[in-house]
C-alpha cells in the first residue's frame, strides 16, 4: 500500500511537460538558389547584340546603294522629260507646230514629282549613312520608312498619270476625239517613253 501511495504521489508531483508545436514555415531551413553567373549572361547578351548589329549594318549598306540608284533614276527621268521637245519642219506664217512637255500638265507634274523625289533621296543619304554607323538606332530608320512611303505614293501617282497620257498619245481615243499625236510627233513620243520607264525602275528600288 505504501508503495502504491508513494507512486501515485510521485505522479502527482511530476510536472507535465508539453512539447512545443512548431508552426508551419518555422523551424525549417531555407533552400537558397545557387548564385547566377551574371558575367556569362552579359557576355551572351553582348554576342547577340553584336550579331544583330552585323546583319542590320548589312541591310543599311544595301539600303544606301538602292537609295543612290533610285536618286539617279529620278533625276534622270526628270531631266529627260524636261528636255524632250520636237518642232515640225513645216510651219505657216502664223503657226509653228511644236511639242513640249509643258503642253500637257500631266507631264509637267511628272517632272516636278521626280525632281522632288530625287532631291529627297539625295538628302536621305546622310540618314542612311547614320544607319550604317549606328545599326541599332531606331529613330533614323523610322523616319526614312515614313518618308519613303510618302514619296513612293507620289511617284506611283505621277507615273500612272503619265502612262495614261502616253497611251493616249500613241493610240488616241475616238470617244473623246483625242487624235494620236505620235503620228506627227514621232521623235517626241519616242523620247518620252524612256522617262516613263525610269520611275517604274525607281519604284522597284
From Swiss-Prot:
Q: Which residues lie on this side of the membrane: Extracellular?
A: 80-109, 170-205
Q: At which residues is glycosylation annotated?
A: 173
Question: Which residue windows are transmembrane per the record?
Answer: 59-79, 110-130, 149-169
Annotated keywords = Cell membrane, Cell wall biogenesis/degradation, Glycoprotein, Membrane, Transmembrane, Transmembrane helix
Q: What are its GO biological-process terms?
A: cell wall organization
- Per the record, the domain of life is Eukaryota
Q: Where in the cell is it found?
A: Cell membrane
Q: What membrane topology was assigned to this protein in its record? A: Multi-pass membrane protein
Q: Which GO terms describe its cellular component?
A: plasma membrane
Record topological domains on the Cytoplasmic side: 1-58, 131-148
- Give the main location: membrane
Read off the Pfam families from this record.
Answer: CASP_dom
Family classification: Belongs to the Casparian strip membrane proteins (CASP) family.
State whether it acts alone or in a complex, and with which partners, per the record.
Homodimer and heterodimers.
Q: What is the stated purpose of this protein?
A: Regulates membrane-cell wall junctions and localized cell wall deposition. Required for establishment of the Casparian strip membrane domain (CSD) and the subsequent formation of Casparian strips, a cell wall modification of the root endodermis that determines an apoplastic barrier between the intraorganismal apoplasm and the extraorganismal apoplasm and prevents lateral diffusion.
Protein's name according to its UniProt entry = Casparian strip membrane protein 4
Q: Name the species this protein comes from.
A: Raphanus sativus (Radish)
Source taxonomy: Eukaryota, Viridiplantae, Streptophyta, Embryophyta, Tracheophyta
Amino acid at each position: 500500500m505504501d508503495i502504491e501511495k508513494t507512486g501515485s504521489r510521485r505522479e502527482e508531483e511530476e510536472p507535465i511537460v508539453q512539447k512545443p508545436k512548431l508552426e508551419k514555415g518555422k523551424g525549417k531551413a531555407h533552400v537558397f538558389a545557387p548564385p547566377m553567373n551574371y558575367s556569362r549572361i552579359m557576355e551572351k547578351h553582348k554576342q547577340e547584340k553584336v550579331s544583330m548589329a552585323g546583319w542590320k549594318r548589312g541591310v543599311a549598306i544595301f539600303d544606301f546603294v538602292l537609295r543612290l540608284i533610285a536618286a539617279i533614276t529620278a533625276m534622270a527621268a526628270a531631266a529627260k522629260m524636261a528636255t524632250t521637245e520636237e518642232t515640225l519642219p513645216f510651219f505657216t506664217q502664223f503657226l509653228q507646230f511644236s511639242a513640249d512637255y509643258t503642253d500637257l500638265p500631266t507631264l509637267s507634274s511628272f517632272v516636278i514629282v521626280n525632281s522632288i523625289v530625287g532631291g529627297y533621296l539625295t538628302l536621305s543619304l546622310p540618314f542612311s549613312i547614320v544607319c550604317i554607323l549606328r545599326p541599332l538606332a531606331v529613330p533614323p530608320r523610322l523616319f526614312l520608312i515614313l518618308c519613303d512611303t510618302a514619296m513612293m505614293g507620289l511617284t506611283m501617282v505621277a507615273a500612272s498619270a503619265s502612262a495614261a497620257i502616253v497611251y493616249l498619245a500613241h493610240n488616241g481615243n475616238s470617244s473623246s476625239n483625242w487624235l494620236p499625236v505620235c503620228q506627227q510627233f514621232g521623235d517626241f513620243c519616242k523620247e518620252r517613253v524612256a522617262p516613263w520607264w525610269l520611275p517604274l525602275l525607281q519604284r522597284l528600288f
